């Protein structure tokens, strides 16, 4: 069993090909790691969210960590960790473009006929919740793998 490093091409491929990653954020003594749907364009990671702990923490401390992996079995996996800055996207046209790209990327993998909202989420009470679109501007990334 030996842990090895992914090269730059392998890191880029894993980031581009996965659908779900995990964001790690920290503020006010709280560390929070949560899975998110995302797209990666070679420079930035783009995500969407409703208001909540993750957004609150990232607004207070924009330094975040992002992790994505592909696990085939216990000794056959690869993982990338990226560090970067949370930036909220506020321009309506850019928000719409990013949301459309997220929908185009995720919809082929959704089993039922539901369509993700384009301007907001609907909560359990049926109220519309503001949709927050953001990016992580990557400053550093590393990758590891194990294959037996």
Regions flagged by a language model, labelled:
Residues 1-17:
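Extreme N-terminal tail/first-helix region
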Residues 12, 37, 56, 72, ...:
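Short secondary-structure boundary/capping segments
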Residues 18-50, 66-67:
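Short beta-strand segments
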Residues 27, 70, 137-140:
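Short, structured patches in soluble enzyme cores that scaffold and shape functional sites
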Residues 49-52, 62-69, 115-121:
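Short acidic (Asp/Glu) patches
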Residues 54-61, 65-83, 87:
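Helix-adjacent hinge/juxtasegments
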Residues 78-148:
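Charged, gly/pro-rich active-site loop segments
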